[in-house]
Amino acid sequence: MGKRALLVRGGTLPISSGFGRAHDTTVKRLTSGSVNGWEIIGEVDHPIDDTGAINRLRRRWFSHPSRVQRIANEKTPDLIHITDQEQAHLVPKNSPCPVVVTVHDLFLFDSKKMNTNWGEIEIGNLNPGFFRRIDLRRLKKGLHRANLAICISQATANHLATIMPDLPSIVVPNSVDVENRDPRINLRTRPLLSEDSLHLLVVGSEDRRKAIGFVLEVIGELEDEIRNRIVVHKVGAESNSLAEKRLKERASKLNVNLRWHGKVEEENLIALEQHCDALLFPSAAEGFGFPVVEAMASGCPVLVNDLGAQNEHPPQSSILPAFDKSSWMEAIVKLNEERIARGSSFRTPRVDLLDAASAYSNAIIGHQHQIAYDTVIRSK
């Protein structure tokens, strides 16, 4: 029998959300045996339901933390793993064992305004409400109680070191089921994509930080002949109706063909990744950048801004100067030229990207996961 980990989070977030997706991959690594010498003895979470603001706050601040403490005392695990920093207040004040917290990003802990060539972008929330300010103080205190922070990227680890230099940290990236996405093994049926168009995929919410509006502006400035061949496919579960309306109006004004998919099933997302001509990911800041690695694992060309943490994953040829419109326009023109030269809607999978994505397999990340757990056990 291996050492026993108790996994803890708040609500049971779906895999269509970043935190939910990362929690799911953590569970899969542990249950598949990829984290050698470790097993899950339980998960502590609660349903996401509309119980009213007061009840939700009472559960978040009082009843759920008490439940975590009680279950930890009853099960006596070797380690408690809280799988995202938004639940760091759940670190028990009297823990029977070491506690690690996965830190995805610190945008809400250390919000700022970023000045870019595309204008000012708010990273996080510079004006949280009264209860959120109290909540953030609780989260920071909880994170300070942890024995180790597991950061999902080097960019996040560097950020953590600037605001919590005394908290030990280790980098364990998110893992991806690379075999499931590999088109050489599991090619999905081509979605309904017009045969003679250039299909460009964007994945993310409508938050300005994700910079989907930047993509629309870049494409809108291309020559008519090229722009008219492009279809932008927008996928993202976190939908803001007002922001969605603004982006659609912006696309219409710029004469950009925007196809709004919204939330899609995982199989449909993989099919788009495998058959679109490229993923465009111009985000201003990321804790990791799941869509980039997942597209790479699908053999899909990617273009990203040279900003953390999405620039940690692809080869240099896929990384563009941040918010430099001319560079992005040139890259898209090149994609169009390659599409015309192929003379076919079939795009050969990018083997170099498949190889790069293999570094995020469950087996490789599982070994890093094991090192993190073993490190905190030895240091306790």
Model regions and ranges:
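Short alpha-helical donor nucleotide-sugar binding micro-motif in glycosyltransferases
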Residues: L143, A271-C276
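Aromatic "clamp/platform" in nucleotide-sugar-dependent glycosyltransferases that forms part
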Residues: A284
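Membrane-proximal helix-turn-helix segments that form the acceptor-binding/catalytic region
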Residues: G124-A149
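Active-site donor-binding segments of glycosyltransferases and PAPS-dependent sulfotransferases
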Residues: R4-V91, A251
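Conserved acidic donor-binding segment of nucleotide-sugar-dependent glycosyltransferases
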Residues: S318-G343
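Short hydrophobic beta-strand element within catalytic cores of glycosyltransferases
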Residues: V292, A297, P301-V304
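Nucleotide-activated donor-binding/catalytic signature segment of Leloir-type glycosyltransferases, i.e.
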Residues: E244-E267
